[in-house]
């Protein structure tokens, strides 16, 4: 097993503000670099997410790639979390902890990474299909990715956060899926979690107005069944209460003068992730 180093405690103090920060060109450049590293890590995982591989082995790869890229994993040591990524399998909604559990044929798994590079956080997650996956699971993954992209289409100056939320909720519920309310997107940049909170269900025309320089994540969690979640005893892992399948995609973005920039988009120019 990899011998991990962690970010010092002085880097773990987060003074989240109720004020939404507006960033300039230096912030955009910092987020581009951090986001590029995050996307490269997920791209590199594709051939490794196969039956028989353990989520701990995946975590080891994420750790090594983050350090090799000049960064450190934001999650490692964060509020006592001991891993470099989150691996959420099947009915796990988010924050699944890597372990010696091996992936099985037919699993769907979300891998969530956040490298810190030069003080900036690149937060992103993607679904991976393991072997031969059932049609209903593939459909859930497709719908969840569509929810993310429809939400991002509303990310432009003059719109409001509720426009993003409504686009996601409308598409998910059109397909009779549940939108998780217990977790949300968040502002980020120099901090891992900052204002605003970005919920994934809501009414159009509500919430803070989007302005150039705002940085935040959009990360819908969509369930085949009901949206309700429960926490496991480890204090991190959230699962669907009805044990239905759950999927999630996440991008970090910045609002520009004319729309938005996706910091964590793959450089491979894919229309959708290679799942």
Go through each PLM region and give its residues.
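Active-site neighborhoods and metal-handling regions in enzymes and metal-associated proteins
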Residues: 1-275
């Amino acid at each position: 097993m990899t011998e991990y180093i962690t970010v010092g405690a002085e880097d773990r103090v987060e003074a989240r503000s109720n004020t939404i920060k507006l960033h300039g060109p230096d912030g955009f450049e910092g987020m581009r670099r951090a986001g590029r590293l995050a996307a490269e890590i997920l791209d590199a995982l594709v051939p490794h997410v196969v039956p028989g591989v353990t989520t701990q082995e995946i975590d080891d790869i994420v750790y090594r790639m983050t350090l090799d890229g000049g960064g450190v994993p934001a999650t490692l040591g964060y509020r006592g979390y001991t891993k470099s990524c989150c691996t959420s399998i099947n009915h796990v909604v988010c924050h699944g902890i890597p372990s010696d559990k091996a992936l099985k044929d037919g699993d769907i798994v979300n891998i969530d990474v956040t490298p810190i590079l030069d003080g900036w956080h690149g937060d992103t997650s993607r679904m991976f299909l393991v072997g031969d996956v059932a049609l209903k699971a593939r459909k859930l993954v497709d719908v969840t990715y569509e929810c993310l992209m429809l939400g991002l289409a509303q990310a432009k100056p003059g719109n409001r956060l509720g426009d993003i939320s409504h686009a996601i909720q409308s598409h998910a519920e059109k397909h009779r899926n549940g939108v998780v309310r217990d977790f949300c997107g968040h502002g980020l940049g120099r901090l891992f979690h900052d204002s605003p909170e970005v919920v994934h269900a809501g009414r159009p025309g509500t919430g803070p107005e989007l302005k150039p320089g705002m940085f935040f994540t959009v990360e819908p969690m969509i369930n085949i069944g009901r949206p309700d979640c429960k926490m496991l005893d480890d204090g991190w892992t959230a699962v669907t209460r009805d044990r239905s399948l759950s999927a999630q995609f996440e991008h970090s973005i910045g609002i520009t003068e004319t729309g938005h920039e996706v910091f964590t988009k793959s450089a491979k120019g894919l229309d959708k992730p290679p799942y």
